Regions:
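Mixed-charge, low-complexity intrinsically disordered regions
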Residues: 1-51, 57-213
Length: 213
C-alpha cells in the first residue's frame, strides 16, 4: 500500500547523485494521465495541467530496513512520491501525486504542540475539506504518535543536498467512487536553521501506467 513503509525515519547520508526513478529526476518532465483524477466522483484533488517539470528532489531513508521515499518537486510545490526498497529506486512500486492545500508558519511553541496533537488523532477535519480517517494505524482509534522523518533536498542531480528537513507527519484517507481513494498528508516541517511550517497536501495514488517521463 502507499506509504506502507513509513513507520520511522532517519537522515539520509549525502549522496553523490540522486536516484532516477522510472526515468524521473531533476530536469525531467513527467506526463500524467488526467483520467487518474477526473474519473473519481467527489474528489478534492484537481490539476489544470497534465505535465510536471521536476526542479527539486528529496530522499528519505526509513529506519529498520523500511526502504526509501523519493520525492520529486515542481516550482509550485506539486510532489510526486515513490517508495522503494532499493536506494536507487529501481524497485519502486508505490506512487502518489500530491498537491499543496495549505501552508502556514507556526506562531509559537503552543501552536506547534497543538498541531502535533492533531497529527496524533484518528480523524482529520480541515476547513473546506471532507473528513479523512487515519491511513496509518488503520482501524486503531487510539491516539498515536506522528511519524518522524528526515528529508534531504537536492536542487542539482550531482550536487550536495541544499537542506535537511525534519518532519512529523500523518497520512489520512477517504474513499471515492468508483473504487478510488484520496489521501491527505498533514505534516509539521522544519528545515535545519529554519522556521516550522504546518502543511496540508491532498494526494492521489497513481499506477505506473498513469504517468511517464
Amino acid at each position: 500500500m502507499i506509504f506502507g513503509g513509513l513507520f520511522g525515519g532517519g537522515r539520509e547520508a549525502t549522496r553523490a547523485q540522486v536516484a532516477v526513478v522510472r526515468d524521473i529526476t531533476i530536469g525531467r518532465m513527467v506526463r500524467l494521465d488526467a483520467l487518474a483524477w477526473r474519473r473519481l466522483a467527489g474528489g478534492t484533488f484537481t490539476l489544470d495541467r497534465d505535465t510536471l517539470e521536476i526542479t527539486a528532489q528529496g530522499i528519505i531513508k526509513l529506519d529498520d530496513g523500511g526502504g526509501y521515499v523519493h520525492r520529486f518537486y515542481t516550482d509550485d510545490e506539486m510532489m510526486l512520491q515513490a517508495v522503494s526498497q532499493q536506494p536507487d529506486g529501481s524497485d519502486a512500486d508505490d506512487f502518489t501525486l500530491f498537491r499543496p492545500w495549505s501552508s502556514t508558519y507556526a506562531t509559537g511553541g503552543w501552536d506547534d504542540a497543538a498541531f502535533r496533537d492533531r497529527l496524533s488523532q484518528p480523524r482529520w477535519d480541515e476547513a473546506g475539506l471532507p473528513p479523512f480517517r487515519r491511513f496509518w494505524y488503520d482501524g486503531d482509534e487510539r491516539v498515536q504518535p506522528p511519524v518522524q522523518l528526515w528529508e534531504a533536498l537536492y536542487y542539482e542531480r550531482d550536487g550536495a543536498p541544499v537542506k535537511h528537513i525534519r518532519q512529523q507527519c500523518m497520512l489520512y484517507v477517504r474513499d471515492l467512487a468508483p473504487e478510488g481513494q484520496e489521501l491527505l498528508l498533514a505534516l509539521s516541517a522544519r528545515p535545519e536553521g529554519g522556521d516550522t511550517t504546518h502543511d496540508i497536501m491532498i494526494g492521489l495514488p497513481l499506477s505506473p501506467a498513469e504517468f511517464s517521463a
